[in-house]
């Protein structure tokens, strides 16, 4: 009797661990897949911490981000359906066996404040991440040890279909979000976000004090300057960095500062208080920016001039790169300087386009989906693209679930029906013998 009870308890425990791991891996893989560039930036942060950034090829962090998202998502689905139980549970144990001590080191040394395990969707402290990984490691060891107790949701006749569709789905999702923009934007600059409100500090809270330093060059000599002592135009911009002088309450948007390249003037308030539309061309590094749509970008600038809208290019590039971009593209729009990390956070495209009004993000486009003359047929006030679509998020949720859940449900139903008729046929054959 006791052995039967123990057998039942182990089965319940194993499947509970299986569903927990499946949920975490599916969610973790999905949020990485919808923001592959964000995962790439986090991997680059790790490489810099370990001192490997200079020795790693530029393409490798992005490749690693794509593979990480696909592996986590696929393992989660395979656990959920009980596919290739031995191999799947082995990979899960190996991953957790590596990540748990790594996050312990992160918690102790704190070189990075957020491990990035759930992208920008859920932010955990390093100690919270370590605690989560200890729990998942226990669950992983359990499903590996008692993998034969995992109840498959599909038979071996159809599990390859589920496995293949899962791989194709997450591959397509990753590539789409890389070419366009993340399907779900968990960052503070999402469509509909009020940048002013994101910068607000609750009453009674002490704000974090930041200092932006600009590295400029003249006659071969580099010097650091602040906004208070920014020099004249005879100095050439090289780089900028934002540092914390005094830690305090940190709002979701804490380093949004637009500095006009021409004279070093801070025009942040001017941009955020503008009750007209403002185009922001965001290119964190012009030397790496995609210049395949330069004609369309110039047409967008001409459109903004024609209808009286402001147009700025925000970048963290040095003056030499800005001049090179102007020569190559014929750009006539004004350039402004901004923190590199902020630019990467604003939009996952280099370059990308953001439309503001009264400091609210109205719309965003990647370099591959910029509005053209066939869309910009009139003033923005009369066009749908200049209105916030309130239904966007809910529609995306339904669409994403429909493309993933419904096909898997269909495969499962076909499998059940097939198995039912197969057993019925076999039973009938046995009766006739």
Per-region residue spans from a language model:
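Functionalized membrane-embedded alpha-helices
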Residues: 11-33, 61-102, 138
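Juxtamembrane interface at the cytosolic side of transmembrane helices
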Residues: 88, 289-295, 393, 397, ...
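Membrane-embedded alpha-helical segments of integral membrane proteins
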Residues: 97-150
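Internal/C-terminal transmembrane anchor helices
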Residues: 154-183
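Membrane-interface segments at or immediately adjacent to transmembrane helices
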Residues: 172-266
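A short, hydrophobic beta-strand/beta-hairpin element that forms part of a small beta-sheet core
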Residues: 212-220, 351-365
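Short active-site neighborhood of thiol/selenol oxidoreductases, capturing the structured segment around
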Residues: 246-248, 254-259, 268-288
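Short, internal strand/loop/helix patches
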Residues: 311-312, 329-348
């Amino acid at each position: 009797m006791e052995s039967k009870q123990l057998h039942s308890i182990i089965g319940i425990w194993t499947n509970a661990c299986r569903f927990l791991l499946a949920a975490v891996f599916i969610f973790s893989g999905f949020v990485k897949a919808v923001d592959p560039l964000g995962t790439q930036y986090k991997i680059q942060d790790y490489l810099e911490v370990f001192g490997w950034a200079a020795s790693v090829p530029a393409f490798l962090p992005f490749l690693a981000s794509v593979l990480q998202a696909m592996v986590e998502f696929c393992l989660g689905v395979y656990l959920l359906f009980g596919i290739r139980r031995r191999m799947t549970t082995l990979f899960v144990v190996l991953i957790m066996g590596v990540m748990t001590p790594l996050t312990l080191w992160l918690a102790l040394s704190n070189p990075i404040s957020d491990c990035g395990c759930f992208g920008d969707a859920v932010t955990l402290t390093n100690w919270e991440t370590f605690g989560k990984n200890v729990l998942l490691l226990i669950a992983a060891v359990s499903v590996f040890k008692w993998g034969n107790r995992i109840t498959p949701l599909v038979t071996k006749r159809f599990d390859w279909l589920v496995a293949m569709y899962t791989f194709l789905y997450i591959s397509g999702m990753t590539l789409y979000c890389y070419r366009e923009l993340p399907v779900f934007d968990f960052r503070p600059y999402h469509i509909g976000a009020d940048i002013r409100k994101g910068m607000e500090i609750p009453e009674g809270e002490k704000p974090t004090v930041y200092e932006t330093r600009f590295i400029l060059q003249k006659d071969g000599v580099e010097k650091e300057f602040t906004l208070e002592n920014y020099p004249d135009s005879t100095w050439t911009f090289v780089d900028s960095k934002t540092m914390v002088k005094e830690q305090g309450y940190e709002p979701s948007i804490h380093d949004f500062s637009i500095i006009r390249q021409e004279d070093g003037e801070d025009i942040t308030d001017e941009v955020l208080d503008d009750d007209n539309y403002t185009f922001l061309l965001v290119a964190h590094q012009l030397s790496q920016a995609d210049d395949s749509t330069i004609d369309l970008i110039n047409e967008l600038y001409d459109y903004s001039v024609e209808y009286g809208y402001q147009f700025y290019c925000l970048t963290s590039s040095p003056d030499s790169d800005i001049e090179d971009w102007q020569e190559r593209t014929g750009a006539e729009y004004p350039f402004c300087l901004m923190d590199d990390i902020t630019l990467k956070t604003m939009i996952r495209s280099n370059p990308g386009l953001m439309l503001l009004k009264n400091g609210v993000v109205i719309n965003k486009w990647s370099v591959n989906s910029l509005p053209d003359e066939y869309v910009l047929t009139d003033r923005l006030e009369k066009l749908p693209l200049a209105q916030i679509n309130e239904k966007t998020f809910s529609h995306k949720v339904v669409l994403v679930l429909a493309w993933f859940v419904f096909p898997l449900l269909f495969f499962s139903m076909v499998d059940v029906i097939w198995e039912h008729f197969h057993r019925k046929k076999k039973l009938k054959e046995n009766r006739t013998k």
